[in-house]
């Protein structure tokens, strides 16, 4: 009898363990199992359970707790279609067998973007050019700052860390960005200079990076004059995720042997970590980064004081959190930690609130001007180096409420703190308090199908104290404020036509001097065929000068920088027409190929265009012209009249799938013709001063090309992934800067300015063009979450300079290990 009871008890356990269990396999077009596919189940209460398919594609999902409920199941895999199934009522005691077959289609590669209209849209159906960089661009290329990831996007270039979108800006000594940088729709530009801190952006927790090209001031305000870069972070889903990445590497010796004044190879050490998890109604994300980068420039001391042979130092294995001291030009040590907290309130349906925070402490030693070419192109010109101890942080409380009728109210805030403690009387600090109230609703409540309406109010206050900005007040204390109201309307007409329109009124004030202006945008998208989309757009932009542009007064050795309290806002409009074509080639000899081709023609015009330009701006009142103040010569932000950028951009994003491997590729080419439309305009009207025009300050005015622009830009990246091994190759190219400030040549050839011999002309004659830059990576992934890869940036160790007087990085060879639990 006891034996029968034991048998009955075992049968009951076996039956109950299989009750409401879903099991099956996930396969691709060729019938092969898909490892890492995500299968989720959702009940009417909004609870989510999930599982990830095993290496053979099989999965098991236990839903015993949901017996008798309606369940919606979905299966997704990156770059493939997402399938859904609904079970009206789970039957108690029943086991379900459910297989999934996912197809690669062009539509599946189409991504959802938020930046284009402040609500989720298909990237193919938006009315403006929006590019999306997936997390793999960051995770597989050994990226330590967002800047190096953005370099892979066609149309995006950098000059000394300053972003350009389609040649919309030049070089401005780090002040007054025309590209708005956002983290989760909130701006992160500094309150005084309007510049980003690239190392501060949280790469360890990326959902995707969205790039809008063209004037976007209607939705994002002043700094979005030529575009927007929005970093969207990821919140946890049903599966907890823990990921740790450890990266060590070294820089190769420069090709110019006489320029190498050191015996120890500079090293780079990087640690990134992330944990995200749902705990009941809480979403919790904790991440961080520790970077120790020696940089690739010369050390502060001569080589004879450091004669160790190259070896991996212990700091590459264990990271000293407290040691932030740097002793080489271009070096940077930083430690960052961030968290995202979100609560889905169970008492008030539709209410969500949370707090995001990100803080970073670091030290860097930077120089904008080399010592002399070619013997010391990795050294620093006297007085041009700055050691900075930086503390930067953001705290972002927010609340969001979704009404039963589908209207979303959100109130988002950001306090941003920045303190740059510099060693050359150029210290600066700022506080920014930003608040935005936004309402988004659809037309369903009014019986208008296809309508999305977004409106909002913005208030921003910035307080700055800096030795740098004494041009505004003797104590260096300055303030700025910004208030704005905007509205955006998106209307679908049937299944094929999408219309968009918006308006914004913005008022700025700096130290009591203000200006306001309305801006507008219009756009349309027409789906001609199943995967063919034609779009057109028109947008206006308005940018008010930053505190730094108006009030900075400093010097870098012989280079003086002067304030301009009379600097006026600049205005812009941009227009484009474009086509996006999806393609799919099934069962070819090499496999299935799907993707999108995009072609855009664009134009952008500027009025009162602000440029950081050289001229006779000094000396200061009461000073006598002398060698110490460069006889009043220097740089200043000035309104230079009108300018225009026209061009064409094309890109291809796609995927090749075979039974044994998968290849993802992104490539693009951008041509721009940025010109001055007022080359004779004198922006130094002082009758006692020398006339200052585009023509008089340009090194090469042929074609009226604007300074610090590269007309031709090409980008390519491919990632090949098999069951165990993966590899990738990147290529990037841009034409050399044909025009820049002639002062860099005139300074060293002016007999009155003795002691300056940068060797710029000789360098340009020997290096008239920029080289192709290649990056490579190869690695192996194990099924238990371990991944090891070798990453080489600047594979050929090309030696080059984009902006005269500033070298770019030589080859960097890194070993990267990642451990992930999900």
Regions found by a protein language model. Name each.
Residues 245, 493, 498, 602-605, ...:
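Gram-negative outer-membrane beta-barrel transporters
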Residues 186-214, 273:
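Short acidic/polar hinge/loop motifs at secondary-structure boundaries
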Residues 95-100, 146-149, 164-166, 179-182, ...:
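N-terminal periplasmic accessory domains that precede
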Residues 410-413, 417-420, 461, 527, ...:
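Membrane-embedded beta-barrel scaffold of Gram-negative outer-membrane proteins
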Residues 262-365, 391:
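Transmembrane beta-barrel wall of Gram-negative outer-membrane proteins
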Residues 147-186, 190:
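Extracytoplasmic beta-strand/coil segments of soluble accessory domains associated
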Residues 185, 276-282, 287, 330-332, ...:
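Conserved C-terminal beta-signal and adjacent last beta-strands/turns
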Residues 27-29, 37-44, 74-81, 91-139:
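Short, acidic, small-residue-rich periplasmic hinge/interaction motif at the N-terminus
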């Amino acid at each position: 009898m006891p034996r029968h009871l034991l048998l009955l008890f075992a049968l009951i356990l076996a039956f109950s363990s299989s009750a409401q269990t879903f099991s099956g396999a996930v396969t691709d077009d060729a019938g092969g199992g898909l490892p890492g596919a995500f299968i989720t189940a959702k009940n009417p209460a909004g609870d989510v359970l999930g599982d990830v398919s095993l290496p053979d594609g099989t999965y098991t999902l236990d839903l015993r707790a949901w017996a008798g409920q309606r369940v919606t199941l979905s299966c997704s895999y990156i770059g493939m279609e997402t399938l859904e199934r609904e079970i009206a009522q789970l039957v108690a005691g029943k086991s379900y067998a459910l297989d999934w077959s996912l197809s690669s289609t062009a539509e599946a590669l189409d991504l959802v973007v938020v930046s284009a209209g402040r609500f989720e849209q298909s990237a193919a159906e938006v009315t403006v050019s929006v590019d999306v960089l997936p997390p793999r661009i960051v995770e597989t290329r050994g990226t330590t700052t967002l800047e190096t990831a953005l370099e892979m996007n066609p149309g995006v270039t950098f000059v000394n860390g300053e972003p350009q979108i389609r040649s919309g800006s030049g070089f401005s000594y780090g002040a007054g960005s025309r590209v708005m940088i956002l983290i989760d729709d909130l701006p992160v530009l500094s309150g005084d200079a309007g510049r980003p801190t690239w190392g501060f952006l949280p790469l360890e927790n990326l959902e995707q990076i969205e790039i809008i090209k063209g004037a976007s001031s209607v939705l994002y305000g002043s700094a979005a004059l030529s575009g927007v870069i929005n970093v969207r972070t990821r919140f946890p889903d049903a599966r907890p995720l823990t990921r740790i990445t450890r990266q060590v590497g070294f820089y190769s010796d420069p090709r110019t042997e006489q320029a190498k004044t050191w015996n120890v190879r500079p090293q780079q050490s990087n640690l990134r970590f992330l944990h995200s998890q749902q705990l009941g109604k809480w979403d919790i994300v904790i991440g961080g980064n520790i970077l120790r980068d020696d940089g690739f420039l010369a050390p502060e001391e001569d080589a004879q004081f450091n004669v160790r042979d190259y070896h991996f130092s212990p700091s590459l294995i264990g990271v000293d959190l407290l040691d932030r001291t740097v002793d080489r030009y271009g070096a940077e040590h930083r430690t960052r930690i961030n968290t995202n907290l979100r609560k889905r309130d169970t008492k008030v349906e539709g209410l969500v609130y949370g707090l995001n925070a990100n803080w970073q402490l670091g030290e860097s030693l930077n120089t904008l001007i080399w010592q002399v070419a070619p013997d010391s192109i990795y050294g620093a010109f006297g007085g041009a180096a700055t050691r900075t101890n930086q503390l930067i942080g953001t705290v972002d409380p927010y609340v969001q409420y979704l009404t039963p009728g589908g209207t979303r109210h959100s109130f988002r805030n950001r306090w941003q703190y920045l303190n740059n403690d510099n060693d050359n009387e150029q210290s600066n600090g700022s506080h920014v308090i930003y608040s935005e109230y936004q309402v988004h609703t659809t037309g369903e409540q009014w019986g208008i199908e296809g309508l999305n309406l977004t409106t909002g109010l913005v208030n921003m206050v910035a307080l700055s104290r800096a030795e740098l900005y004494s041009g505004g007040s003797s104590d260096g204390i300055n303030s700025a404020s910004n208030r704005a109201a905007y509205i955006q309307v998106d209307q679908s007409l049937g299944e094929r036509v999408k219309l968009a329109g918006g308006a914004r009124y913005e008022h700025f004030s700096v130290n009591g001097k203000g200006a306001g202006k309305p801006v507008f945008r219009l756009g349309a998208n027409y789906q001609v065929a199943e995967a063919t989309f034609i779009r057109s757009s028109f947008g206006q932009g308005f940018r008010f000068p930053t505190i730094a542009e108006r009030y900075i007064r400093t010097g870098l050795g012989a280079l003086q920088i002067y304030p301009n309290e009379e600097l006026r806002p600049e205005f812009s409009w941009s227009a484009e027409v474009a086509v996006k074509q999806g393609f799919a080639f099934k069962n070819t000899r090499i496999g299935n190929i799907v993707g999108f081709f995009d072609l855009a023609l664009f134009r952008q015009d500027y009025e009162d265009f602000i440029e950081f330009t050289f001229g006779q701006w000094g000396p200061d009142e009461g000073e006598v012209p002398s060698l110490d103040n460069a006889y009043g010569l220097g740089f200043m932000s000035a309104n230079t009249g009108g300018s225009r950028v026209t061009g064409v951009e094309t890109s291809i994003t796609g995927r090749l799938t075979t039974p044994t491997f998968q290849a993802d590729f992104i490539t693009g080419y951008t041509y721009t013709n940025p010109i001055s439309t007022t080359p004779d305009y004198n922006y130094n009207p002082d009758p006692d001063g020398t006339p200052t025009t585009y023509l008089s300050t340009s090194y090469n005015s042929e074609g009226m090309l604007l300074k610090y622009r590269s007309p031709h830009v090409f980008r390519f990246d491919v990632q090949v992934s098999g069951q165990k091994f993966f590899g990738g190759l990147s290529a990037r190219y841009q034409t050399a800067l044909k025009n820049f400030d002639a002062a860099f040549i005139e300074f060293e050839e002016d007999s009155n300015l003795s002691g300056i011999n940068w060797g710029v002309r000789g360098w340009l004659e020997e290096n008239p063009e920029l080289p192709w830059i290649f990056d490579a990576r190869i690695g192996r992934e194990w099924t238990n979450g371990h991944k090891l890869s070798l990453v080489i940036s600047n594979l050929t160790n090309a030696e080059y300079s984009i902006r005269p007087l500033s070298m770019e990085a030589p080859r960097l060879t890194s070993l990267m290990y990642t451990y992930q639990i999900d």
